[in-house]
């Protein structure tokens, strides 16, 4: 059995609703469960075979011996598939009332009405609501849940699925490949530039639940898309598992920005594989906000395949009591004149632990490639810790690599300066933290910047005394 989760304090999205699911698999991971998931979804035979092969791969692979402590994660105590409703609705009014109330509390309809081009909401294992502006459909943009894409766009789906993150990549990508459900599928045709964000929202509601969405984004030549996802879960005494796979293909001269704002409860293991292939003069941006969870292990990866390809990761990690944020980035330079940037901001308080773990690789063909890495950590008390673990591989002597790492505490001089102007110690500390994360929040859409600042302020409550 999974052990009792650590104290979660006043986590604001910790409410949970009565179980209204129409189907729930038995706990534990077996071949029968995998077949049941595929059968429920009425999938083609090739996908069932892919799932079963992935399950065998999962059993063969050992648990990671690096990163956070996974010893309490019990795969036999997890529910791998929960179907919350019969259909994916295109009208908000048609979403089941109990589920709608949850997303109303989280502001999903409000956010859509304000500025989103399309929105998808996943509850447990399935997308329960999906909508996109008609003018985008008229341009040939495909934005739907991944299960629908498999049914309705099978040829395009099969062309790209599992080409970026194969099942055998790691133990948790194998697990996802065996039991994946939901997620987003996006295809943007050649030279179509979408400035307004597409959004997906992922919510775990049940105890001991596993959520395994699979997201696949293809930006064709000269295309551009901005995708934003948000994640929350209730507070329970036992652990839940979120293990997603994200695959992105950025074709020649295309641009993708992928923004994540996660605020999981302290009983969630968040173990995610994100990777993109970036071709000639393409540009990939990861903007990654990591709050909450018991343990996060996530390292967005750019494989720079074509000359002039660019990749960047801008991340923030906040670890409080009982939390470990083991996050970072990977930049793989495979072509000439490629460039990458990693900016990592980490904050730890109340005994939390933050780890930056990154890889920058320069291949033999990466002549003229360059990479810049900046890791800044702010530690708010004597109980909290931080580690920086960079790993650089260089197989070409014509490259440029810069790495800067800095760990600091809130200084008495900073506090004295602010407090001498009538500001309390708690408010002064909050101001210093908000200034520290400003390079991250300024890259977010306005509504998300406001929400991120609010979440950080919420995490900061009670930091003094």
Swiss-Prot record:
GO BP annotations, alphabetical order: iron-sulfur cluster assembly
Pfam families, per database record: SUFBD_core (PF01458), SufBD_N (PF19295)
Family label: Belongs to the iron-sulfur cluster assembly SufBD family.
Protein name: Iron-sulfur cluster assembly SufBD family protein SSP1857
Source species of the chain: Staphylococcus saprophyticus subsp. saprophyticus (strain ATCC 15305 / DSM 20229 / NCIMB 8711 / NCTC 7292 / S-41)
Lineage of origin: Bacteria, Bacillati, Bacillota, Bacilli, Bacillales
